[in-house]
Curated annotation (Swiss-Prot):
Its EC number is 3.4.21.-. It is an enzyme of class 3 (hydrolase). Disruption phenotype: RNAi-mediated knockdown is semi-pupal lethal, with 50% of pupae dying at the late pupal stage or during eclosion. Adults display impaired melanization at the site of septic infection (septic injury) using either Gram-negative or Gram-positive bacteria. Reduced survival, PPO1 activity and induction of the antimicrobial peptide Drs following septic injury using the fungus B.bassiana. It comes from the Eukaryota. Ca(2+) binds at E202, D204, K207, D210. Residues 137-390 form the Peptidase S1 domain. The lineage of its organism: Eukaryota, Metazoa, Ecdysozoa, Arthropoda, Hexapoda. This is Serine protease 7. Glycans are attached at N141. PROSITE patterns: CLIP (PS51888), TRYPSIN_DOM (PS50240), TRYPSIN_HIS (PS00134), TRYPSIN_SER (PS00135). It comes from Drosophila melanogaster. The active site is at H182, D244, S341. GO terms for biological process: defense response to Gram-positive bacterium; melanization defense response; positive regulation of melanization defense response; proteolysis. Residues 1-27 form the signal peptide. It is found in: Secreted.
Amino acid sequence: MKSTRKVVGIFLATCLLPFTVLQNVAAQGSCRNPNQKQGQCLSIYDCQSLLSVIQQSYVSPEDRTFLRNSQCLDGVGRQPYVCCTSDRSFGSQEATSAAPPPTTTSSSSRGQDGQAGLGNLLPSPPKCGPHSFSNKVYNGNDTAIDEFNWMALLEYVDNRGRRELSCGGSLINNRYVLTAAHCVIGAVETEVGHLTTVRLGEYDTSKDVDCIDDICNQPILQLGIEQATVHPQYDPANKNRIHDIALLRLDRPVVLNEYIQPVCLPLVSTRMAINTGELLVVSGWGRTTTARKSTIKQRLDLPVNDHDYCARKFATRNIHLISSQLCVGGEFYRDSCDGDSGGPLMRRGFDQAWYQEGVVSFGNRCGLEGWPGVYTRVADYMDWIVETIRP
């Protein structure tokens, strides 16, 4: 018979660690579990309630999710740590699916940023922005196979029928992808082609099935676009690229799995200030120092620039920025490039979930010293997003 530690180790290695969402942890090991019950951050080996779940002959998908979402930081004893209470599974409120939405679309019916009414169309942690625990990363800028699993690739078809993956985007719920307006209308239509398809669950575009060692993801999803909605004030002829944001409604609901999850958006209750010098993360399949495009999903940590400095810099190119545009980066050969357009600019919240703060918009060449990239600030468009999405 296998020892308790071996059984737990096998379970964690195959089912838990790569796909975990961390819970918010306060000082001295206090935490809240997925049912929002206060507990202690302990080694799972010292938490009998959750250890007993793992030791069952069959662990249901719901219990696996509860275990994943129970992990915490800064615990006591041997890793991994869990927020330990007497709970063994989701409470009745968590286990019950959301009620069907009412038909009204007014912002008042949704509460702040759509958190009430309409079936809570924008998810909140732990149902968005999961953190990867996989350590299977071979190159410095490659992501883990399950990292940033809301990333989307946009596919275009030109007038000769040739297909090309160009822009990026991010899944924000099971029906919508957030991207840049310039990835939908304007020069992209003549230079790349007509936007036709969204690809989800991608890691390495050169392979049909993506594996790192013995970890393989599920097949990618190819979804059509039922409707593309560009911000009404976006003007593709305006080189300032103000309001460069768009929503893609997919032709069917996405069945979420460990490799396809939505990112969190900065709702009023979770919104944080963005400070100069703070490191944010951009991800995509854009140009690298050695190739026009990367086949493997990349990540890069970039500092936020002072907005006034950035605005003055771009004014010398007769480009005039407004407060809803973020400036990030500006380091030599460290930038979001080409194919990253429309992709997310992200950061970890206090609850350890990932939030999308920006959409890749434009820059003055790529990776040019002293020239930051410009991103559409998502928080400034939350009202528009909430008013646009529907069940």
